[in-house]
Design a protein with these regions (language model features):
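Active-site glycine-centered loops adjacent to acidic/histidine catalytic or metal-binding residues
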Residues: 10, 36
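Short glycine-aspartate micro-motif
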Residues: 30-34, 40-42, 72-74
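A short, polar/charged loop-to-alpha-helix boundary motif
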Residues: 56-69
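General beta-strand structural signal in soluble alpha/beta enzymes
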Residues: 4-9
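ATP-binding/phosphotransfer module of carbohydrate and carboxylate kinases, centering on a glycine-rich
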Residues: 1-3, 17-27, 49, 67-158
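Short, acidic, Ser/Thr-enriched surface-loop or helix-capping motifs
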Residues: 44, 55
Length: 158
């Protein structure tokens, strides 16, 4: 017998998996967000993957969350979520913060990565906490807007 194989974007496939067997089980509408070196997402509407006209329907990393940003994102726009909520975005935020002031922080003593920033947060490092708050602020903006656009309602049992 012949088995068919389909290939898809990692975030889209993750969203399908969550809908079929995970946190989205039993729901026909959901948004899955993936955070890594970039920010991706899979959007499922009425049980179907939203792929968009050019196959980039779930590229939520390029939602604009900061209209005052002066640096360009890799896509050419400014203020994209990926500039703040990806691993590379967290490093960018940290390097910018370290260059702007002389505050004492363990981040000056090691190569900055998303992991070192969040490890420093666990150690109550004030600079790392500020960076994490900025990360969370922009991720929160995007998630709130995605929830509103998807027609979701807040869960009361959190």
């Amino acid at each position: 017998s012949c088995t068919s194989v389909k290939v898809g974007n990692d975030a889209n496939v993750a969203a399908l998996g969550e809908m079929w067997k995970g946190g989205g089980f039993g729901h026909k509408n959901m948004v899955m967000v993936t955070l890594g070196t970039g920010v991706g997402g899979g959007i499922i509407s009425n049980g179907h993957m939203v792929v968009g006209g050019h196959g980039a329907g779930g590229e939520i990393g390029h939602i604009c969350v900061n209209y005052e940003e002066t640096e360009k994102c890799g896509c050419g726009n400014r203020g994209c979520l990926e500039q703040y909520a990806s691993a590379t975005g967290i490093v960018r935020l940290a390097k910018k913060r370290l260059a702007e002031n002389d505050d004492e922080t363990v981040l000056r003593n090691e190569e900055v990565s998303a992991k070192t920033v969040f490890d420093a947060v666990k150690e109550n490092d004030a600079v790392a906490i500020e960076i994490a708050k900025e990360f969370g602020k922009y991720l929160g903006y995007a998630l709130a807007n995605l929830a509103a656009a998807a027609g979701g309602r807040p869960r009361r049992n959190l």
